Amino acid sequence: MAYVIGIDIGTSALKTLVVNKSGDVVESYSVSYNTAHPKSGYSEIDPEIWYEATLESLKYILNHYTHNDLTGISFSGQMHGLVVIDQEGNPIRPAILWNDTRTSQEVEDIKKNLGLNSLLQLTQNTVLEGFTLPKLMWLKNHEQDNYKRIYKFMLPKDYIVYKLTGNVYTEPSDAAGTIMFSVKDENWSTELLHRLNIDPSICPEIIASHQKSGQLTEKVKNTLGIDSNINVYQGGANNACGALGSGITDEQKQLVSIGTSGVALSIENSTDYENDGNVHYFNHCVPNQKYIMGVTLSAGYSLEWLKQLISADENFTTFLKDINQSEVGANGLMYTPYLLGERTPHNDASVRGSFIGLDANTTQLDMKRAVIEGITYSINESIHIMKNNAININEIVSIGGGAKNNQWLQIQADIFNTTITTRTEEQGPAYGAAMIAAMGEQWFNTFNEMSEAWIAYHQKVYPIETNTKSYQDLFNIYKTIYD
C-alpha cells in the first residue's frame, strides 16, 4: 500500500496527515508551538521550531508505517511570513509572521514610492502590513547588517522543504502573497524589485506546487532512521491548499472558511480581470488557476471574544445551542466584527467594532446571534464583490468553525442567498497538501479527477426565502455603518 503525507505549518501548530490512494486519512499527528511577541505588534518564531516539529511528526509516522510505503511529502504553509537565510543556509533571524504589524511605515513608503495603481499593475494586489514585501523593507530599514547577509528569503513552508531537501524553491500560490510577484505572469516582478532596489537574486526559483523539490537528504534520512528515498513536492499556501482540499478546483464552487479569521474564495481565471485592491488576487496551487479572496480579520475571533466575556467555561456547542430563539436580525441588534480592524473591503487597520441597537430588552442570545450575523455580513461583502465581477455563485462549500453549527450554516445560506455545502470529513489545508503530493506521485492525471475521486460532501443547506429577504435589507444597513 502506498501513502502520501500532507503537512500544514500553521501559526500555532503543525498538522500531519497520512493519506492512502483512496483518499482516506489513515493517520494524523499534531505538534503545538508558541510564537514570540518581543514588542507590541511583533510576531516571530525561530524557524527551526517548525523543522523540529516536522521531524517529530515524521518520526511518529515512520513508527507506524513502513517507510518504503511512504512515497511523497508535500506542504501547506501560513502565508506572508519572512524567513531569511545566509550563504551557509542558516536562518539570519527569527521568522516574521503574517500577523506581525510592525511595518506600517514601510507600507506607506511602498505606496508612495510605487503608487497604488503601479503596484496593482505590477502584482495585481495592494500591499498590507502582514505581507512579505514590507517585512523585507523593514529589515532593510532597521536591521541593515541582517539585510546585507541575506542569501535567499523564503516563505515558512519553503524553509522546511529546504531543510529536508537542501533545495531553495517556492511556488506561485505562496509567492503571490509576497506582493513581489506578478500573479498574471507567474514570476517575480523584476520592475518592482528594481524600483525598490531589491536584489532579484535573493528571490527563490519558482516551480509548480506539485513539482518535485527533491528527496530527503542523507542527513535527514539518518535522523529519521530510514534508508529509502521519499520524494518532496513544494506544496502551496494554506488558503490555496484549504480550497483544494475542499474540492475548489474550478469555477463551479466557492469556499467560505470561518476560523479565527474568515475567508471567501472563488476561482477567477478571466484574462480581463483587473483587481482594484479591495480583494486579494492570488495564484492557486492548481496549475493555471487563480482565485480572488476576501478576508474578515475577526470572524471566529469575535465569537471567542464574546464567549470569554459572558460564558468563558462553555464549549462552543453549548454556547450557540439556542441562538434560534433570537429572531432573524437579533431583535434589532447589529454587530460589526472590527475588533482587529478590517481587511475586505476596507483595508482599515484602525477601525474598531461595535454593537448597534442595544436596549434594555437585549439578551445574551441576541448578542450571540448578532455576532454570528455580523461575521456573516462581513464575509458577504466579499461574496458581493465576487458577484459584481460576474462570478456565478450557486454553491458555497463552508468549512471551519462556521460549518460545525447547523444554525450558523442556515444563517450563511440565508445571508449569502446560496446553497451551502459541507465536507463529509474536513481535514483542512494538510489534506490539500496531501493531494499535491499525490499529484506529484502521478496518482491522478488532473486535480479535477482527484477531487471527484477523493472529495465527498456531507449536507446541503438551502436559503429560506423569507429570511433572505429580511437579511437583504439588514445587509444594506450593515454596509452603511462603516461609511
Swiss-Prot record:
Site (Important for activity): 8
Domain of life: Bacteria
Residues at which substrate binds: 79-80
Pfam families referenced in this protein's UniProt entry, alphabetically: FGGY_C (PF02782), FGGY_N (PF00370)
Entries under SUPFAM superfamilies matching the protein: Actin-like ATPase domain
Gene Ontology molecular function, alphabetical: ATP binding; D-xylulokinase activity
GO biological process: D-xylose metabolic process; xylulose catabolic process
UniProt keyword list: ATP-binding, Carbohydrate metabolism, Kinase, Nucleotide-binding, Transferase, Xylose metabolism
Keyword Transferase: yes
EC id: 2.7.1.17
Catalyses which reaction(s): D-xylulose + ATP = D-xylulose 5-phosphate + ADP + H(+)
InterPro entries: ATPase_NBD, Carb_kinase_FGGY, Carb_kinase_FGGY_CS, FGGY_C, FGGY_Carb_Kinase, FGGY_N, Xylulokinase
Listed CDD domains: ASKHA_NBD_FGGY_EcXK-like
Keyword Nucleotide-binding: yes
Family classification: Belongs to the FGGY kinase family.
General function of this protein: Catalyzes the phosphorylation of D-xylulose to D-xylulose 5-phosphate.
Protein name per Swiss-Prot or TrEMBL: Xylulose kinase
